[in-house]
């Protein structure tokens, strides 16, 4: 919801700002991670909702990027970039140099298989902000984030994962 302009417009009368809320949640997350073992890899997935192939919010990462990407004590981010609701890759400029980014470029909401070359071009665009050796590829979210799951067959889900693997091998070797 932090990225959703409509959500924040609806909260205009509240006495809280996006910046205050983002800073509060960042502090809470970092406090929760304070005593984690040093060798534990901790990541954050920024989700826009994933219920039966629908979504709950939209908007690019720009509103939260300066808070989250530069300051959260995690090793990597799993970010949704499967459609126009996710915005562009420009907010990746805020990701600190010690973190990795997993690009969720393959949607888990639709059975339609993405075009490999389109995904590879999008990876190249993201690499303008994060070096390729710190980028990874995955589906945008889980295939069954809730009991009912998304509107894909098991075969279609495996095809999406095979596509991710094929692209990763071609891009990263």
Task: Annotate each PLM feature.
Residues 1-173:
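Domain-level signal for soluble alpha/beta catalytic cores
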